[in-house]
Amino acid sequence: MKRAFIMVLDSFGIGATADADRFGDVGSDTLGHIAEACAKGEADNGRKGPLNLPNLTRLGLVKAHEGSTGKIAAGMDGNADVIGAYAWAHELSSGKDTPSGHWEIAGVPVLFDWGYFSDHENSFPQELLDKLVKRANLPGYLGNCHSSGTVILDQLGEEHMKTGKPIFYTSADSVFQIACHEETFGLDKLYELCEIAREELTEGGYNIGRVIARPFIGDKAGNFQRTGNRHDLAVEPPAPTVLQKLVDEKQGHVVSVGKIADIYANCGITKKVKATGLDALFDATLKEMKEAGDKTIVFTNFVDFDSSWGHRRDIAGYAAGLELFDRRLPELMELVGEDDILILTADHGCDPSWTGTDHTREHIPVLIYGPKVKPGSLGHRETFADIGQTLATYFGTSPMDYGKNML
C-alpha cells in the first residue's frame, strides 16, 4: 500500500537563498534566528530556554539547516543520529508567496510574474473598486492600502461595523484581501463578495494570485480577532500538479487538511478537511492518516507558523509552535506504514526577526521519513519540484516537467 503524507510548516525557512538579494532578504534565516533568540533567553515568553526540537532534529532538520547556512543552529544538536533523508531546496519560482511555493512542491513552478498592487496608499485601481461597489451593492469601502491584517482591524474595524463598508487591503504578496465582521456583515456575504472580486480580477487581467476572505469577530478596537473561517480563492495552477496526476491517472485520493485545497483552487483534491489551530490541524491529520487507503496523499498546511507568528514577527510564539509540533511528531511517525513516506517541508520563509512583515526568500527543509527511506543527506535541491517528481515516481504517474526524483 502506497501512501504519502506531506506536512507543510508554512513559512519555516532554513536560510537565505543565493538570489535573496533580489528580494532584500540576504541574511534571513527563520530557523536560525529563532534558535539564536531562544539560546540567548530572548524568547522565554510562554516557553523557556534553547529551541528544543529533538524529533525534527532526528529527521535531519539541523543538518539541512547546516547545509543551507554552513552553521549549526544555536543551542541545537548538530551531532544527533539522523533517521531520515534530508535536503535543503531552492525555489525556482519567481515569487516567495504561498501559491508559488505549494505549486512548485507539487511539481509546477511559477515561472511567470504575478501581478501586485504596489502602491502603499490607494492601492487598488478605481475602475476595479467601482465595479466591486456596483456588483456587490456596497455602501463604499475602507482601507484601499497595504497593511498588516491585525493592525487594520484596530484602525478600521469599528467604522466597518458602523457603516457596513468592507475593508480592502493588500501586502507585498499578490493578494486582494477583504476583512469583514462575521456577525454584522455576515460570512456568506463576505464569501460572495470575494467571489465577485475573484471574477473581476481574473476578467480584468490583473494576474493576482489570491483573493482572501478575512472574517473577524469582536466589538471594538483592541479585541477584534480573526476567525478560522478564512477562505482563499486562488487561480488554478498553470499545469497538472502531481496531485492531479495521482487522481486522474491512478484513480488515487488527495486529502486536503487546512488551506491546501484553497491554494490549489481545488484542483486534484478529492476530500477537504477544515481545522483551525496547530493542535486541531494535527488531530485532523492523524485521523485522515489512519483512514487513508492505497494511492492516497494526505496533505496538510500548518498555517499558524506563517499567519500567527511569522508575519506577526513573534519569535517566542513561533518557537513555542515549533516545540508543540515537535512534541506531537512521534504520533505522526507511528502511523507511517511499511511502504509509506512522510515529507516535512515548507513553502517559503517568514523570518520573525526580520524587518517588515513579509515573507523571506529562503531554502526550505525537505525531510523524508519511512521504513524504506535510506537516511542521510540528499544535498542541495535546485527546485522544490524535486518533491513533486519524487511523488510522481513513487506513485508511478507520468513524470513532471520539472524536478528530479530524490529517492
From Swiss-Prot:
Its EC number is 5.4.2.7. GO terms for molecular function: magnesium ion binding; manganese ion binding; phosphopentomutase activity. It comes from the Bacteria. Mn(2+) 1 binds at D10, D347, H348. Transmembrane segments: none annotated. It is found in: Cytoplasm. GO terms for biological process: 2-deoxyribose 1-phosphate catabolic process; 5-phosphoribose 1-diphosphate biosynthetic process; metabolic compound salvage; nucleotide metabolic process. Its main location: cytoplasm. Its cofactor is Mn(2+). The keyword Metal-binding applies. It catalyses: 2-deoxy-alpha-D-ribose 1-phosphate = 2-deoxy-D-ribose 5-phosphate; alpha-D-ribose 1-phosphate = D-ribose 5-phosphate. InterPro entries: Alkaline_phosphatase_core_sf (IPR017850), DeoB (IPR010045), Metalloenzyme (IPR006124), Phosphopentomutase_DeoB_cap_sf (IPR024052). GO terms for cellular component: cytosol. Mn(2+) 2 binds at D306, H311, H359. Pathway: Carbohydrate degradation; 2-deoxy-D-ribose 1-phosphate degradation; D-glyceraldehyde 3-phosphate and acetaldehyde from 2-deoxy-alpha-D-ribose 1-phosphate: step 1/2. Binds 2 manganese ions. Keywords: Cytoplasm, Isomerase, Manganese, Metal-binding. Isomerase that catalyzes the conversion of deoxy-ribose 1-phosphate (dRib-1-P) and ribose 1-phosphate (Rib-1-P) to deoxy-ribose 5-phosphate (dRib-5-P) and ribose 5-phosphate (Rib-5-P), respectively. Belongs to the phosphopentomutase family. NCBIfam families: deoB (TIGR01696), PRK05362.1 (NF003766). This is Phosphopentomutase. It comes from Salmonella gallinarum (strain 287/91 / NCTC 13346). The lineage of its organism: Bacteria, Pseudomonadati, Pseudomonadota, Gammaproteobacteria, Enterobacterales.
